[in-house]
Amino acid sequence: MDTKLLELLVCPVTKGHLEYDREKHELISRSARLAYPVRDGIPVMLENEARTLTDEELGL
């Protein structure tokens, strides 16, 4: 994922910072506890396409 693009993107739910998980190809919003998929290099920033993160995934 392009780092400049990542700097511009925010979580559509919280408007907060996103982290890119290279292994799972997901953008992580810790504040919303959601992981948005990146398909073919394109972030899918739809809440209904995101999966909920577990406490373990968040390191809690």
Curated annotation (Swiss-Prot):
InterPro entries: Trm112-like. GO terms for cellular component: cytosol. Transmembrane segments: none annotated. It comes from the Bacteria. Signal peptide: none annotated. PANTHER family: PROTEIN PREY, MITOCHONDRIAL (PTHR33505:SF4), ZGC:162634 (PTHR33505). Belongs to the UPF0434 family. This is UPF0434 protein Pnap_1922.
